[in-house]
């Protein structure tokens, strides 16, 4: 399909969605309206760039005609010609193949791996890094479940990270790169001899379905247990039996939620996490032979299966998938992940274009 034909199809779809969203019946159906809003936000950048391109071409044609009579317009025509080239490149980039989940919210699990208490402390630092990045970029973060270590580290934490409004580039578009084993090299706070040690934490990331109903889950396949929430020091912990643990019997997947005040709310959020994990599992199985990112996520907490290393003594971060290295570990841990994510996105885009 030519670029012109592709843009025409998108303009037609965009206008159709616009008409649907202004229909009172659609506005009364929040599920449908949310889906349309999401698709609308995905198409809007393409429409905006295409509109600028159409205008620039019209202006360029007019400037060239006027340049015959007034040489001052020659410079304007030249500037517009350069703008057209830039806009054409932007449009081609927007039309390039992309991950269909890029606009999605996510569920993230961070687990301490090899390294005991030090691994749990490192897992906690990863969580704070993601929270700071999310705050800087307008995402909302919700803690769904937490198990802490004796020193306040994270043994296991489940997070929901969401866009505040529908977006073409949602949480999945950046956080999907975090799935895998993260290795840390430093002197642990528990080390009395001052020796550098290696520990690890694992991260799992799943795109979150818009609705639990989108994923088939049979009630007969579920075991639901209710228990009293627990946390280090008892701070901010519910004193009623409101925490919920759901086991999906066919797969053995277990999800918990203890953040909300009621069993009903905790069960609803746990079901959302389960739906995300089942959806990811189904897609992973379907793509088992394709080298997709989700298929390459962590399987064990083995320190050798690493995607990234955080070297404290040298203040260096290394992403082993793309050969990225930078000596700004301190700022990265403060949530400054833009350069790293841009490099990972560029590598993914190049890989997708090559596969076409």
Swiss-Prot record:
InterPro entries in the record: PCRF, Pep_chain_release_fac_I, Pep_chain_release_fac_I_sf, Prokaryotic/Mito_RF, RF-1
Subcellular location: Cytoplasm
The record's account of how the chain is modified after translation: Methylated by PrmC. Methylation increases the termination efficiency of RF1.
GO cellular component, one term: cytoplasm
N5-methylglutamine: residues bearing it: 235
One GO MF term: translation release factor activity, codon specific
Main localization (coarse): cytoplasm
Keyword Cytoplasm: yes
Superkingdom of origin: Bacteria
Keywords of the record: Cytoplasm, Methylation, Protein biosynthesis
Disulfide bonds: none
Function: Peptide chain release factor 1 directs the termination of translation in response to the peptide chain termination codons UAG and UAA.
Sequence similarity: Belongs to the prokaryotic/mitochondrial release factor family.
Protein name per its UniProtKB record: Peptide chain release factor 1
Gene source species: Corynebacterium diphtheriae (strain ATCC 700971 / NCTC 13129 / Biotype gravis)
């Amino acid at each position: 399909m030519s670029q012109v034909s592709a843009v025409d199809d998108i303009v037609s779809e965009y206008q159709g969605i616009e008409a649907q969203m202004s229909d009172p019946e659609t506005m009364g159906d929040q599920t449908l309206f949310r889906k349309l809003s999401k698709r609308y936000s995905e198409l809007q950048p393409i429409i905006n760039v295409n509109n600028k391109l159409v205008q620039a071409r019209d202006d360029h044609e007019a400037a060239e005609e006027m340049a015959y009579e007034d040489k001052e317009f020659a410079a304007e025509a030249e500037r517009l010609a350069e703008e057209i080239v830039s806009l054409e490149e932007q449009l081609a980039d927007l039309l390039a193949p992309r991950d269909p989940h890029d606009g999605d919210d996510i569920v993230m699990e961070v687990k301490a791996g090899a390294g005991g208490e030090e691994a749990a402390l490192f897992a906690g630092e990863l969580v704070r890094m993601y929270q700071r990045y999310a705050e800087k970029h307008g995402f909302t973060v919700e803690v769904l479940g937490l198990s802490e270590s004796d020193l306040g580290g994270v043994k296991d934490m489940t997070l929901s990270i969401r866009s505040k409004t529908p977006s073409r580039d949602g949480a999945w578009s950046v956080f999907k790169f975090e799935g895998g084993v993260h290795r840390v090299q430093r002197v642990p706070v528990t080390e009395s001899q001052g020796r550098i040690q290696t520990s690890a934490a694992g991260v799992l990331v799943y795109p979150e379905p818009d609705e639990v109903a989108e994923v088939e889950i049979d009630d007969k396949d579920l075991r639901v247990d209710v228990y009293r929430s627990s946390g280090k020091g008892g701070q901010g912990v519910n004193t009623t039996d409101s925490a919920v643990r759901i086991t999906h019997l066919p797969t053995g997947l277990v999800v918990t939620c203890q953040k909300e005040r009621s069993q009903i709310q905790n069960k609803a959020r746990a079901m959302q996490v389960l739906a995300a994990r089942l959806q990811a599992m189904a897609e992973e199985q379907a793509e088992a032979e394709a080298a997709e990112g989700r298929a390459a996520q962590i399987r064990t907490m083995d320190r050798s299966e690493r995607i990234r290393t955080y070297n404290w003594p040298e203040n260096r971060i290394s992403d082993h998938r793309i050969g990225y290295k930078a000596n700004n570990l301190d700022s990265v841990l403060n949530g400054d992940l833009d350069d790293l994510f841009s490099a990972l996105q560029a590598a993914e885009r190049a890989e997708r274009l090559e596969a076409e």
